[in-house]
A protein has these predicted regions:
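Anion-binding and metal-coordination hotspots
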Residues: 1-372
Length: 372
């Protein structure tokens, strides 16, 4: 039933101009207070920072216009890197998509995933683990290709970036640097090194369990450390940096803009978890758990549709404000001169906007209770 609803919703929105070419995918974990059904509730890597609880994994796919397309659910011990290719294969079959460009974060990627994407001739824009990927760390970041200044607008503000394209071993990388983040990273590192110097003056033992400090240390003996200037110099290359790998022909700014849109999926997860109360989940059966989570996905679809309709009116409505204003609507039954009437409260401005966008007409302010 879930698949049927998702496919019919997509078909309803689809027209001759609809092309589901750009797909954003991310996953999150949803923890359980109990066992979590017969198979879904398993211990795994917890993005909720609750490794003590059983959990399930939820993936949401969003199109290039920011609209939820479909959701997928797995047991909580499922690794992110195993989910991307099967989901994209199913997506193409279900929605009859010939050409698709996948945008996903670094946690979704492995060497096997990359090989599968290449074998299927799928377009992709993927985040890269710049610290743990040896090729990126040692060759891509140090490549002599020049950085080109870019400006990205976000919430009315201009953010300065610079980017360079590196072609290496048949792969295309885009190295991006956020100048503000680079300055912050440098300042944070200077603060840590200063704190290190103070700690070293007091004694080495306090540093043994501090992984944040030990990144910049070298071991002198079993319990003695010193600041390692080579490690500090190496860290500078990562200041404000993120790296993309893509096989598209998009220019660096276009690729960056696509990748940055992943925040829409992350925002959807936050909305589902908090505004729509996806957690806590107290259901005992897999099928009822799936139904509970799918209701949150449908709420995301409705939220997206309403926001799109409000935008079409040239207006902007805050979701918490919309909910609060709609919640303030009330009716009271009163008796006057032997007759009973229903009196409706006046809608607040944001509620009026939402109702207008949804095409919903309110009943009269005062009406005969008998007629109702």
């Amino acid at each position: 039933m879930k698949d049927v609803v998702e496919e019919r919703l997509f078909a309803h929105r689809r027209d001759l101009l609809t092309r589901l070419e750009l797909v954003f995918m991310d996953t999150t974990s949803l923890s359980f207070e109990g066992a979590g059904g017969q198979t879904l509730g398993q211990h795994g890597y917890s993005k909720d920072h609750r490794p003590d609880l059983r959990q399930m994994i939820l993936a949401v796919l969003i199109d290039g216009d920011g609209r939820p397309v479909c959701s997928e659910m797995w047991p909580g011990n499922t690794a992110d890197v195993t989910t991307l290719v099967p989901v994209i294969d199913r997506l193409r079959r279900r929605f009859d998509i010939a050409r698709v460009c996948v945008v996903a974060d670094r946690g979704m990627i492995s060497a096997e995933t990359m090989a599968e994407l290449e074998a299927r001739r799928l377009l992709y824009i993927l985040g890269v683990r710049e610290r743990s990927d040896k090729l990126v760390r040692e060759l891509v970041l140090d490549h002599p290709a020049p950085f080109v200044p870019l400006v990205m607008k976000k919430r009315g503000k201009e953010i300065e970036y610079e980017a360079k394209t590196v072609l290496l071993a048949g792969r295309r990388y885009i190295v991006c640097r956020n100048r503000q983040e680079a300055e912050k990273d440098a300042a944070d590192r200077a603060s840590i090194v200063a704190a290190l110097e103070r700690q070293l003056a007091k004694g080495d033992k306090a540093l043994i369990g501090n992984t944040g400090f030990r990144r910049y240390l070298k071991t002198i003996s079993e319990e003695h450390f010193a600041i390692d200037p080579d490690k500090i110099e190496e860290e500078k290359k990562f200041d404000g940096i993120f790296v993309l790998r893509t096989n598209t022909d998009l220019n660096p700014l276009e690729a960056m803009l696509c990748y940055k849109q992943l925040w829409t999926v992350e925002q959807s997860f936050r909305t589902a978890k908090h505004l729509f109360s996806t957690r806590p989940i107290f259901h005992k059966l897999d099928e009822t758990i799936r139904g509970h989570v799918f209701c949150s996905f449908l709420a995301l679809v409705l939220k997206s549709e309403l926001e799109e309709r409000i935008a079409a009116l040239g207006r902007v409505g805050s979701w918490p404000e919309i909910i609060a204003d709609l919640d303030s609507l009330a009716e009271t039954e009163i008796e006057y001169d032997g007759k009973r009437f229903i009196v409706r409260s006046a809608p607040r401005p944001t509620a009026s906007l939402a109702l207008r966008a949804a095409g919903v007409a309110l009943p009269p302010t005062v009406r005969d209770a008998a007629a109702s």
